[in-house]
Amino acid sequence: MNYRHVTFAVAFICTSVATAASAEPRAVIELFTSQGCSSCPAADKLLGELSSDPSLVTMSLAVDYWDYLGWKDTLALHGHSDRQRAYAEGRGDREVYTPQVVVNGTVHVLGSDKAAIEKAIAQTRHKPGVLALPVTMTLRDGKVMVNVAATQNELRSGEVWLCPVTSKVSVEIGRGENHDRNLTYHNVVRRWVKLGDWNGKSETFSVPLAELPKGEYSLKDIDRLDVVVQSGVAAKPGPILGAASTSCCTASTN
């Protein structure tokens, strides 16, 4: 995935410090969805329900490969399509579809099947290294501070990614399979920002909020930040080793 960084000024209208929950998540749920997919609204709704569980990091990743059906997804990133295909190639099954959920970077299931998602969570918790890595995230003085602990686990290298997220977005669909519907999306990932590489040692990554990339969205819509430490590389992602999530300040550009 290719990412472009844009520098801009921000003005915060919140407290200066916010800390991620101390409890480590039991799962990272990535939903690959599309506004042009008539099977997706049920999965989008389910993700909203799962998002109320504080032990889960839930992420909505809109893809763009259904845009040719008549409606251009307003939340899609081409990088999400690339990420989904990379997962499929890594698993060796080449199964790319919507709605698809990938649990902890390892197992995929139908995104609207709650029982299958819960089963996948239970299965992946026993895989070596999955979410065994303590990760904390703090917002302080206009910076995001991410600390990744040291480990002696078998999987002790990976990439550290920061995702600006919008908790809730409603969209009027004008064409395509979902035309004339008003659909709500939860925990919409707006961008993937690589903070750096992690190599098994305790390390802190810092980035000014003012230097986060600005995608096709208004900065004031960003109200959450997720961080994911994932084995492998972007073109061949592996199990998710650690993750954290925190509420983010509402901000506006100057």
Give the predicted meaning of each segment.
Residues T74-R94, V107-N254:
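Short, conserved sequence motifs used for protein processing/export or organelle targeting and
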Residues V101:
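Ligand-binding face of N-terminal immunoglobulin V-set domains in extracellular IgSF glycoproteins
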Residues M1-H5:
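Positively charged n-region of N-terminal signal peptides that target proteins for export
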